[in-house]
From Swiss-Prot:
Record organism: Drosophila persimilis (Fruit fly)
SMART domains: HATPase_c
This protein's name: Heat shock protein 83
Reported function: Molecular chaperone that promotes the maturation, structural maintenance and proper regulation of specific target proteins involved for instance in cell cycle control and signal transduction. Undergoes a functional cycle that is linked to its ATPase activity. This cycle probably induces conformational changes in the client proteins, thereby causing their activation. Interacts dynamically with various co-chaperones that modulate its substrate recognition, ATPase cycle and chaperone function. Required for piRNA biogenesis by facilitating loading of piRNAs into PIWI proteins.
Keyword Cytoplasm: yes
Amino acid sequence: MPEEAETFAFQAEIAQLMSLIINTFYSNKEIFLRELISNASDALDKIRYESLTDPSKLDSGKELYIKLIPNKTAGTLTIIDTGIGMTKSDLVNNLGTIAKSGTKAFMEALQAGADISMIGQFGVGFYSAYLIADRVTVTSKNNDDEQYVWESXXXGSFTXKADNXEPLXRGTKIXLYIKEDQTDYLEESKIKEIVNKHSQFIGYPIKLLVEKEREKEVSDDEADDEKKDDEAKKDMDTDEPKIEDVGEDEDADKKDKDGKKKKTIKEKY
């Protein structure tokens, strides 16, 4: 039987900050991605540091990276890291019930005309996700706890519960449900541009999963059975995210005028 989600009220200053972020117009919303990548990098630093004295800390996943997954169909942008992860109490305390010391100071700075891009300096960069998302879920797995998921569509409260979905092994997965008027942040070119502009000095690989379509001729059997094995990895250049092939989706089977079956393949690289 699935565990009931617990509901928590945001601490008053955090609720105020979120309201300010959601209800005020800011032109440079793109800084949300810089903040979430920066947080992911910090989490990776922490597990790497712990592993220096206890290498077994990396038994739950040796590869340290950040992965970005835009999904236009679902309207989501997902940011995954294989960092230290958060326990249930970390999720509840750090993302809602205990205000960081910079929360009030940042609100005062904003109201005095400071730019939203300063949010990370006050330690509350996570909430910049609400510049472009109307709902956020944070799934996290720390070596010392089970996997939990945090969720909030703002409105003053958030939920947390044990997560029995796909196991992360270790790390954090943030899913942003993008606002209808912000879907350009699901475009590959836009994501690359932001990463290159704001996150070029991150010390871990940033992998971007993208989808491409091509047509190819196949036999009827191949249309059902064919799977692509080889990985096409390319580095766009040293500062850009790494592109990783994770397979393909098939659709739109059709026959051309010669009777040869064709299919449009959506490939994720």
